[in-house]
């Protein structure tokens, strides 16, 4: 593999990476690993929900790499907006959605099937990928009625389908994780990876199978950044290539991501 031009010239460069909130912890370790072989590269990570990041890119925010928690946002950037650099898009990891509670909650809930027994549920809004996947799972489990686009199913409709249970609508998966870990809500749905580091506070009630949620693919791609110089652009490509190496996969697995995907 050829080292970056950045290192040959001793030139420093910065690449801007927009990554889904659920990638925050693993990305910090991945960036550190990448910098071992690219000491002159500064990787600037910005983390938020995939939908928010997509909007920022569409509104002209400078960005070199978009790492989304869902295919939907990447398709929008790629096919609708035409802002993805050809040939740079890869599926990186899969992530399982989990139903969680806090330790010693004594909840009666065991799975989605008896979710209506919860005193309260933390649930991400349908525009947030984990909220969309949860709605899809509830539709496939026969709890929610089908919709053309499950992400448009309002929180109130989910509550009604569960017999009027109180739902705390969250703006991103981090808010769901906090609400349950703190005991503000009895149960919630988060990614398996969100339970990393919270093993002593969260209990997984159910790892929701992919046949209910569908695949939870995280795609990455280089974003057309007119402000980027050539060095920044080639380095962005190298960072994307790094994300599908065995070294990177080992790190992803440590944070409970599923690397068994076609890159």
Predicted segments with their positions:
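Short glycine-biased active-site loop of nucleotidyltransferases that positions the nucleotide triphosphate
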Residues: 58-59, 90
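Sec-dependent N-terminal signal peptides of Gram-positive bacterial secreted proteins and lipoproteins
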Residues: 1-2
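Acidic, polar ligand-binding/catalytic clefts
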Residues: 72-85, 90
């Amino acid at each position: 593999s050829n080292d970056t031009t950045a290192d040959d010239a001793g030139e420093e460069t910065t690449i801007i990476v927009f990554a889904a909130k659920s990638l925050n912890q693993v990305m910090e370790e991945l960036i550190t690993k990448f910098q071992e072989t690219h000491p002159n590269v500064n990787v600037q990570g910005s983390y938020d929900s995939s939908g928010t990041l997509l909007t920022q890119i569409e509104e002209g925010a400078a960005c070199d790499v978009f790492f989304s928690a869902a295919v939907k946002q990447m398709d929008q950037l790629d096919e609708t907006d035409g802002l993805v650099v050809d040939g740079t898009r890869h599926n990186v990891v899969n992530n399982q959605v989990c139903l969680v509670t806090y330790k010693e909650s004594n909840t009666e809930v065991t799975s989605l099937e008896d979710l209506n027994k919860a005193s309260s549920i933390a649930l991400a809004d349908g525009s947030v990928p984990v909220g969309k996947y949860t709605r899809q799972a509830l539709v496939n489990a026969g709890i929610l009625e089908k919709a053309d686009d499950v992400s448009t199913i309002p929180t109130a409709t989910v509550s009604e389908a569960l017999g009027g249970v109180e739902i705390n609508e969250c703006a991103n998966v981090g808010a769901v994780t906090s609400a349950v870990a703190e005991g503000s809500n009895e149960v919630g749905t988060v990614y398996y990876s969100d339970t990393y580091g919270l093993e002593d506070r969260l209990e997984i009630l159910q790892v929701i199978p992919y046949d209910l949620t569908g695949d939870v693919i995280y795609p990455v791609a280089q974003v057309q950044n007119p402000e980027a110089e050539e060095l920044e652009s080639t380095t962005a490509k190298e960072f994307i290539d790094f994300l599908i190496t065995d070294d990177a996969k080992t790190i992803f697995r440590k944070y409970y991501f599923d690397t068994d995907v076609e890159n």
